Curated annotation (Swiss-Prot):
Record keywords: Aminoacyl-tRNA synthetase, ATP-binding, Cytoplasm, Ligase, Metal-binding, Nucleotide-binding, Protein biosynthesis, RNA-binding, tRNA-binding, Zinc
Binding site for Zn(2+): C144, C147, C156, C160
Family annotation (Pfam families): Anticodon_3, tRNA-synt_1g, tRNA_bind
BP GO terms, sorted: methionyl-tRNA aminoacylation
Protein name: Methionine--tRNA ligase
Gene3D superfamilies: HUPs (3.40.50.620), Isoleucyl-tRNA Synthetase, Domain 1 (1.10.730.10), Methionyl-tRNA synthetase, Zn-domain (2.20.28.20), Nucleic acid-binding proteins (2.40.50.140)
Enzyme superclass (EC): ligase
Length: 663
């Protein structure tokens, strides 16, 4: 048991578009974890809310002819309703544009100002002469100064993943009108992130959670830590103290929402929010893998500087693929939670189960309708549902009901072992392992009833057959309690079929081995329906039609370059001499490449697709005249060219000498 109350949060959904499967990889595991803790007897408060500020909201609102407030309210209600349908039960679901968050954000800024952690500085920022305005964040696109990839104004989302400060991006272009932006000076405010380097190093080594969150962040902290610009030139947002022309950067006020939403919950329940943020409470953040930088570096430093408690655990999910393709709304590789699933009448529990059972939480999840249907049919219908229905149907049909007997010790021991396995998995945030342990118990039950064959035994030894069913009913009770965090609607159905009149969620998992109340049983209902091939084909067709429509629309027209500009790139063939992984990075390899006249060290983001030893001797195409950049503390003097989601290396179709130019 924890010393104090536990606060669990989920990364805030952004209110500029509807819910999709990528969102659910954060919220379903978070909800499962909270339900599990409550079954263990812990006091848990589960908060989240919608993220309403930042340039994407403003840009989307302008495109749709509505105000940012109207757009935010529309999608706030959308997410709130979708989460309820998915069985995700937040104790408080607030808005970052609410009064509580405006107040708490400004209060935190003032604390940091008073402690000397915020200072002003004049910076060069992209300015569009056509639109006559400064271009914060996603109003601008350009080239990442660190790795040379196409990047947004505040983040290199296509390359190294680094946060970008205002004015850092190279060759900036206005996203609204396409005009090449110019740099102009403007006063902004900075948070002294560099002062927290030692604290962050210690914090990241001690915080619980998933390694993908901690290790990436440690790499950034050990590399370099720059002070952080925390204001933007926008009207929409939380006003910076004393400045009506500046708002607080969205990646400051969004996580502050965790505190504000806790305050709102506490006010409604007669509690003090400081129990969680200033006392002995535990704070666990569930986030998407793409926002680890903000939650593992910026946020703990802000909390420490302002005198609040810091997170106890940070749990980051892996990425998502759709049918072996990188998740992409613009290319049609997306599954919408409502349009493609809930609105078709498909049960929320099926999708919850699939998301939790498919793979480890930190690994990439490759969704396909066929794989989804296979798991529903083979695991839920054939294994779990089959055992529960066989047991309850036989107990009812033979007039056995719930007999006034004790379950055999072997059965109780097997349940205890399963509970221990679930506890171990959940403590390590290995949600798949926890689900697997429960499904193993269901498979054990299936094998037990099949081997014991009570339908035969009852003809010759009714007491023995009754004991078998009593044992099976104990397993069914255990399965209801253990599967509730994963499939709450299914667990409630089982609980009711066992004749219980209260809610399964109000019971502890340790009660799984307690005796059942003897009595009659009503006829059971079917838990799961098989997914037929025709249904799967229809779902697959919908996805493929979306992809085809996206291909017809094509991608936005890109700015053309002249042949002279293209000619500035020095493309040559090189041979990989050595390759090794870069510590604390799952994506990057350090390559030594023979370019004929010299050997170059190049960092390449292909570690997920190639073993280092297999690259040695390979011919590759290199951009050889890029400015050197440092990535994860390693200097890179060039770029290896690769194509597609699987990073297929570009190579000549016949042998050529290192240093041969591409023409």
């Amino acid at each position: 048991m924890s010393k104090g109350p536990i606060l669990v949060t989920c990364g805030l959904p952004y209110t500029n578009g509807p819910c999709h499967l990528g969102h659910l990889r954060t919220y379903v595991p978070g909800d499962m974890y909270v339900r599990y803790l409550r079954h263990r007897g812990e006091e848990v408060v589960f908060v989240c809310g919608s993220d309403n500020h930042g340039t994407p909201i403003v840009v989307s609102a302008e495109e749709q002819g509505v105000t940012p407030k109207e757009l935010s309210l529309k999608y706030h209600h959308h997410f709130e309703e979708t989460f309820i349908k998915m069985g995700i039960r937040f104790d408080r679901f607030g808005m970052t544009d609410g009064k509580a968050n405006h107040h708490r954000t400004r209060e935190m800024m003032q604390r940091l100002i008073d402690k000397g952690y915020i200072y002003s500085a004049t910076v060069s920022q992209s300015y569009c002469t056509t639109c006559s305005r400064f271009l914060p964040d996603r109003y601008v696109e350009g080239i990442c100064p660190h790795c040379g990839a196409v990047a947004r104004g505040d983040e290199c989302d296509q390359g190294c993943g680094k946060h970008l400060e205002p004015g850092e991006i190279r060759d900036p272009v206005c996203k609204v009108c396409g005009t090449r932006a110019e740099l102009r000076s403007q006063e902004h405010f900075f948070f002294k992130l560099s002062a927290f380097k030692e604290f962050l190093g210690t914090f990241l080594k001690g915080v619980r959670g998933t390694d993908n969150a901690k290790n990436y962040a440690l790499g950034w902290v050990n590399d370099d830590l720059h002070d952080w610009c925390i204001t933007r030139t926008l009207d929409w947002g939380v006003k910076f103290p004393g400045r009506d022309d500046l708002v607080v950067y969205v990646w400051v006020d969004a996580p502050v929402g965790y505190i504000a939403f806790t305050e709102e919950w506490a006010a409604a329940h007669g509690r003090d929010w400081r129990e969680f943020w200033c006392g002995d409470g535990e704070i666990t953040h569930f986030i998407g893998g793409d926002i680890t930088y903000h939650h593992c570096i910026f946020w703990p430093a802000l909390l420490k500087g302002a005198g609040y408690g810091v997170p106890s655990a940070i749990v980051a999910s892996g990425m998502l693929k759709i049918d072996d393709h990188k998740f992409s709304k613009s290319r049609g590789y997306v599954v919408w939670t409502n349009d493609d699933y809930l609105d078709l009448g498909l049960p929320a529990d099926y999708l919850r189960y699939y998301l939790l059972a498919y793979t480890s939480h930190t690994k990439e999840l490759n969704f396909s309708w066929q794989a989804f249907a296979d798991r529903v049919n083979n695991e839920l219908v054939n294994t779990f549902g089959n055992f529960v229905h066989r047991t309850l149907h036989f107990a009812h049909a033979q007039g056995i009901g719930i007999p006034d007997l004790d379950a055999d010790q072997e059965i109780l021991q097997r349940i205890d072992e399963t509970i221990a396995a679930v506890d171990t998995a959940m403590d390590a945030f290995e949600f798949k392992n926890a689900v697997d342990a429960v499904m193993t118990l269901a498979a054990f039950g299936n094998n037990y009833i099949q081997t014991a064959a009570p339908w035969k035994l009852i003809k010759t030894d009714r007491p023995a057959a009754v004991q078998v069913i009593r044992n099976c009913l104990q397993l069914v009770r255990a399965l209801a309690l253990l599967i509730d965090p994963t499939m709450p609607e299914t667990a409630s159905k089982i609980w009711m079929m066992l004749g219980e009149t209260d809610q399964v969620r109000d019971h502890r998992t340790s009660e799984a081995t307690e005796p059942l109340t003897a009595g009659e049983l009503a006829p059971p209902t079917t838990l799961f329906a098989r997914m037929e091939e025709k249904e799967v084909a229809t779902l697959e067709k919908t996805l493929m039609m979306r992809v085809e429509e996206a291909e017809k629309r094509g991608q936005p027209t890109e700015e053309l370059i002249s042949i002279d500009e293209f000619g500035k790139m020095k493309l040559i063939v090189g041979t990989v001499i050595s390759a090794e992984k870069i510590p604390k990075s799952s994506k990057l390899l350090k390559l030594i490449v023979d370019l004929g006249s010299e050997r170059r060290q190049i960092v390449s983001g292909i570690a997920k697709f190639y073993d280092p030893e297999h690259l040695v001797g390979s011919s590759v195409v290199v951009i050889a005249n890029l400015q050197p950049v440092t990535i994860f503390g390693v200097e890179s003097r060039g770029m290896i060219l690769a194509a597609g989601d699987n990073a297929a290396l570009l190579t000549p179709n016949q042998a050529v000498e290192p240093g041969t130019p591409i023409r």
